[in-house]
């Protein structure tokens, strides 16, 4: 049903995916489309060229008949650049509740930006994470396995690895909070002590006060 809605009766169409990542969800749709005799042009959009290269290699191996054209960049610039081709109908995917990583104003701007480039035969499918029991959401962002914690603290490891900084990751903690009134889950990295961080090439060192927080992640939940 999802594929039929996206294809909208067309055998050839361009399938854009915002924030494609590894494309694991979309591969099922693409495989099914090819099995039905359709000829989609998959156009994943991601800020990471490495991710897109890896995705392209995987799809060439798993779905060799698939047409593939990646778009690297921020959502807005990729939309402006990639949505201008009128030769095929467009279907746009924004899955995995990724829209929740934008604040309200950004989400509205993105939806409007996509809509402005869609015609009457085009389709747009967005995945939203709905509001639910606050305890359930708090557990998700403070999971016992520490997956969300490690995901956020990995930002510090990357700063050390890619910029040569001397952050002591052990001196930071991950602190998630959830506001049920706004439906907004936020993640922070908090310094547990006064500390100074040096980054090669930076004009001056970065000073952290004890319990100073850095906002690292937003996950907006939606209702009707």
Functional labels for PLM-detected ranges:
Residues 1-13:
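Conserved alpha-helix/loop element of class I SAM-dependent methyltransferases that forms part
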Residues 25-29:
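Residues at the N-terminus of the alpha-helix immediately C-terminal to the conserved SAM/SAH-binding loop
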Residues 116-131:
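Conserved beta-strand signature within the Rossmann-like core of class I S-adenosyl-L-methionine
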Residues 101-113:
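A short, conserved alpha-helix within the catalytic core of class I
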Residues 19-24:
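Class I SAM-dependent methyltransferase "Motif I" SAM/SAH-binding loop
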